[in-house]
Design a protein with these regions (language model features):
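Patatin-like phospholipase
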Residues: 2-321, 325-327, 332, 340-346
Length: 347
């Protein structure tokens, strides 16, 4: 949805989903040319190790035996800058000003409520809205952890009505309420624990509902994109007469292609200059900055950012880096904001 709102065509989206880059993003794997940056830990006789911070009391020690997410966020933390930073600039943080107005839903599990994402950093909004618990690591927005919006509202027709007042809503249902959990199925147990029951319906007077049965499709089955695309396309074509009978507006295909091209051509190039770091002391900040540029005023590219990012994560001093790009219209560059989490090992 976000890609379409940014000016991607359906063909553009299929190409992206089938790309080798996308496979790395959702798997957390590092590209071959950056693997050499990573150092291997020296072999030790340890059976396992426990991490804790020396800055905290030993009484508050909480050994971490399990990862917080199945998918390593190392790729996703970085690529969302490349995918979404320029679109955030183009719409000035107002999702109504994207190529197609956009909403997505995230969940504040602490306060037990949905978060309607309609402004701010587009990448953060999308990242939060897709962070299914235990599968993807959540992100922090306004000091709360934000998860997949489907926990509280998996079919937000109410949001679309209230925000956009559409004449017609076309709803696509590709999910269902969780079935009874099975003893040996962890995902079904998690779904039942976290997801609220959803009303997947649209009154005939309000719109058109298309329902798909994907019982054998998993959350990470991106390799089946052609199969799933064809199912969706064929189902839509079979309903096209009824859709056209209710939607009378027509748009020239060449015109929409041109409009997409013009909109995306206005995205400012990712050129970075200033670096702002949170989570490190003065000496550590100086060390981190040197990985990206040698002088304070020198600009660097996204490729430079990518190389420095993987180098920093290779030295076992930093456990995670969460980058954000903030645009400076005065000189057409971006400030690079880095939220850094340092390693504290005790083995």
């Amino acid at each position: 949805g976000s890609l379409y709102a940014m000016g991607y065509s359906p063909d553009d989206m299929v190409d992206l989903l089938k790309s080798e880059d996308f496979k790395r993003w959702y798997s957390g794997e590092v590209e071959e040319k950056y693997v050499y940056h990573f150092k291997k830990n020296l072999p030790t006789p340890e059976f396992f190790n426990i991490r804790f911070s020396f800055r905290d009391s030993l009484k508050s020690l909480k050994p971490q035996f399990l990862p917080t997410s199945v998918v390593n966020p190392i790729q996703m933390n970085l690529v969302f800058v490349d995918l979404y930073a320029r679109a955030t600039v183009a719409c000035k943080g107002d999702f109504d000003k994207l190529f197609v107005p956009f909403r997505c839903i995230a969940s504040d599990v602490y306060n037990k409520k949905q978060l309607i994402m309609k402004e701010g950093d587009l990448g953060d909004a999308v990242r939060a809205s897709m962070s299914f618990p235990f599968m993807f690591k959540p992100i922090e927005i306004d000091n709360v952890l934000a998860y997949d919006g489907g926990i509280y509202n998996n079919f937000p027709t109410d949001v679309m009505k209230n925000d956009f007042h559409p004449d017609i809503i076309i709803g696509s249902v590709v999910s269902a309420n969780p079935t009874k959990p099975k003893e040996n199925d962890l995902m079904s147990q998690i779904e039942n624990m976290v997801m609220q029951k959803t009303d997947y319906s649209i009154p005939d007077s309000m719109g058109i509902l298309m329902t798909f049965k994907y019982d054998n499709v998993g959350l990470m089955d991106f390799q089946r994109v052609d199969e799933l695309h064809d199912i969706g396309y064929n189902r839509t074509i079979s309903m096209m007469d009824s859709i056209k009978s209710r939607i009378h507006r027509r748009v020239n295909l060449d015109n929409i292609r041109l409009r997409r091209m013009v909109y995306r051509s206005n995205y400012p190039e990712l050129r970075f200059k200033n670096i702002i770091i949170d989570g490190a002391n003065t000496q550590q900040q100086a060390y981190i900055k040197k990985e990206f540029h040698k002088s304070d005023n020198k600009e660097f590219s996204y490729e430079d950012l990518k190389q420095g990012y993987f180098r920093l994560l290779s030295d076992n001093m930093i456990s995670e880096i969460i980058p954000h790009a903030i645009y400076n219209p005065e000189d057409d560059t971006y400030d690079l904001h880095l939220k850094v989490k340092l390693e504290n090992n005790f083995a």
